[in-house]
Each structure stands twice: as structure tokens, then as C-alpha cells.
């Protein structure tokens, strides 16, 4: 009976360790998706390279930094 109890305890410990996500766990696709969704400012079609900023209309579309 003690062998069965030890086996049950080991199985419960292993299951509980794998079932609970750790704090540092992230889905593998999240960083890649964030990079895909982000448009670099210099590549934004409304970015003004002479002023090195975006007009206020483009700021609503994610272009940073904003002019004025």
C-alpha cells in the first residue's frame, strides 16, 4: 500500500508542476506578432524625413513621434 501511495504522490506532484504555468511563460507567437504589428516610424508612409516626425493625422495611425 505504501508503494501505491508513493506512486500516487509522485504522479500528483509531476502533474501539478506541468499543469501550472510559471510566471515567465509566454506564448511563442506573441513576440513575433508584436513585431509584425509594429510599423517602424521611418517606414511609415506619412513619416516626414525632413522634419523627422509625423503629422497629427498619422499619429492616430501609430506613427511616432508627432509633429506639433
Swiss-Prot record:
This is Conotoxin tx3b. GO terms for cellular component: extracellular region. Keywords: Amidation, Cleavage on pair of basic residues, Disulfide bond, Neurotoxin, Oxidation, Secreted, Signal, Toxin. The modification Cysteine amide is found at residue 67. Residues 1-19 form the signal peptide. The cysteine framework is III (CC-C-C-CC). The modification Methionine sulfoxide is found at residue 61. It is found in: Secreted. Its main location: secreted. Disulfide bonds join 53-67, 54-63, 59-66. Intracranial injection into mice causes scratching, hyperactivity and circular motion.
Amino acid at each position: 500500500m505504501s508503494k501505491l501511495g508513493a506512486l500516487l504522490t509522485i504522479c500528483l506532484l509531476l502533474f501539478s508542476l506541468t499543469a501550472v504555468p510559471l510566471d515567465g511563460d509566454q506564448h511563442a507567437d506573441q513576440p513575433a506578432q508584436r513585431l509584425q504589428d509594429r510599423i517602424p516610424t521611418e517606414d511609415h508612409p506619412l513619416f516626414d524625413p525632413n522634419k523627422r516626425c509625423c503629422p497629427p493625422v498619422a499619429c492616430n495611425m501609430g506613427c511616432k513621434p508627432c509633429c506639433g
